[in-house]
UniProtKB/Swiss-Prot annotation:
Pfam families, per database record: Ribosomal_L21p
InterPro entries hit by this protein: bL21-like (IPR028909), bL21-like_sf (IPR036164), Ribosomal_bL21 (IPR001787), Ribosomal_bL21_CS (IPR018258)
Organism annotation: Pseudomonas fluorescens (strain Pf0-1)
Annotated GO MF terms: rRNA binding; structural constituent of ribosome
Descriptive protein name: Large ribosomal subunit protein bL21
SUPFAM superfamilies (UniProt xref): L21p-like
Length: 103
């Protein structure tokens, strides 16, 4: 059984027992989270597609950790001007474990 959920402006295909890094949620480590924006639920050949969401479907998850991704380095360069600007960015994430899918 798997589902497609929306969180942080992105869509994720999830299955029970899976670990996932999503955009940061303001939830403490160890607490549970419920996602109610479920776009699709599939159990074998039985596929339920929402319009836009599946009514009554939820995905439950447990927060494992909070952290930051590796640094992404950005360089802005102006040709022929001997000018270069170096920057970096580290995005926050929340790691979750999918504990249940209810359709």
């Amino acid at each position: 059984m798997y589902a497609v959920i929306v969180t942080g402006g992105k869509q994720y295909k999830v299955a029970e027992g899976e670990y996932l890094k999503i955009e940061k949620l303001e939830v403490a480590t160890g607490e549970s989270v419920t996602f109610d924006r479920v776009l699709l639920v599939a159990n074998g050949d039985d596929v339920n597609i929402g319009a836009p969401v599946v009514a009554g479907a939820t995905v439950k998850a447990e927060v494992i950790s909070q952290g930051r991704h590796d640094k992404v380095r950005i360089i802005k360069f102006r040709r022929r001007k001997h000018h270069m600007k170096r920057m970096g960015h580290r995005q926050w994430f929340t790691e979750i474990k999918i504990t249940g899918i209810q359709a």
